[in-house]
């Protein structure tokens, strides 16, 4: 049962207490402005998540949700590699309306 739980981490949590790189987790915060880069030859995407204290790099290979935008809340599920300070995501969730921020992200931004 424990192995099926995805714990939530902010960028500061990942900096201060990184999980094992073989454990799937959720990381969230705001998509940092001007950090979004797309590979023109593939679906590979790079962006950064910030909690306004620390920032982590995120790589993702796939289509982003329509509501994914810079300076908006996001939760990524995947694996964090502390040696690269990089989060490799296999799922990206974006907020679903203008006023919604996931509770975990809101708490991380406090």
Predicted regions mapped to residue ranges:
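OB-fold and OB-like single-stranded nucleic-acid-recognition modules
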Residues: 1-110
